[in-house]
């Protein structure tokens, strides 16, 4: 089964920009934190996959989705208002694609949306631009590390991109397999997220994350960490497991 790394690679395959000073791949990411209603479980949520796929295909939805369940994290570290059980993430190649897809979904998916409403509640929906700044290994499985950062005075996005590329290359040289992304410029984000950047590292599996974690503390990445710290101030790391919900076909 395809999981987080493969789904994200598929979403990214829609759009690539070949410029040393621009993102390797760009996309839009929709984030919907949700809480399951009393008596409902994540199994009930995942049981909706086939119905969602049918509506998405009928609507021409260029949109790959999966459910992120928190693992190592504290509520205060997440840029989410209120408590939540999981986060729905959806990837689309452009605003045009997501807008056209939503029009189709609103026409074809009202009954399905009513079923979702019986399962979960949500009080936040945001849309951010995403960039892949370092490409790692796609494979089965998915474990994500997230940090919320703000640019330091005098720093810009190009410098942050360069710092993340340098870190990704150094980690890869040490044997890490993660892809590195940054998300920013959100619509619908909380006030405290204004001007922030979410740095995301996607590992093929939790074991791959554990191997990278051990190698990080066994190695010397002082140069790369200094470059990042000179560019941005970041909060604590939080992690999630990713489970696929729907995979759009590229092209």
What is the predicted role of each segment?
Residues 1-18:
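Gram-negative bacterial Sec-dependent N-terminal signal peptides
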């Amino acid at each position: 089964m395809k999981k987080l790394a493969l789904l994200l690679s598929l979403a990214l395959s829609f759009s690539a920009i070949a410029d040393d000073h621009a993102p390797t791949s760009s996309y839009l990411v929709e984030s919907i934190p949700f809480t399951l209603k009393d008596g409902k479980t994540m199994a009930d949520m995942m049981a909706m996959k086939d119905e969602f796929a049918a509506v998405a295909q009928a609507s021409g939805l260029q949109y790959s989705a999966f459910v992120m369940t928190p693992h190592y994290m504290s509520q205060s570290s997440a840029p989410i208002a209120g408590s939540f059980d999981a986060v729905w993430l959806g990837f689309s190649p452009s605003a045009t694609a997501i807008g056209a897809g939503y029009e189709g979904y609103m026409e074809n998916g009202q009954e399905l949306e009513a079923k979702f409403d019986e399962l979960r509640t949500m009080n936040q929906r945001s849309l951010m631009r995403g960039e892949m700044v370092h490409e790692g290994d796609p494979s089965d499985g998915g474990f994500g590390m997230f940090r919320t950062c703000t640019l330091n005075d005098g720093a810009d996005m190009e410098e942050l991109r360069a710092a993340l590329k340098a870190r990704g290359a150094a980690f890869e040289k040490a044997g890490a397999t993660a892809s590195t992304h940054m998300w920013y410029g959100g619509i619908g984000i909380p006030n405290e997220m204004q001007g922030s950047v979410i740095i995301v590292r996607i590992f093929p599996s939790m074991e791959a994350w554990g191997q990278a974690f051990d190698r990080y503390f066994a190695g010397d990445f002082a140069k790369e960490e200094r470059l990042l710290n000179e560019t941005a101030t970041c909060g604590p790391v939080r992690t999630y497991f990713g489970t696929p919900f729907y995979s759009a076909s590229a092209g």
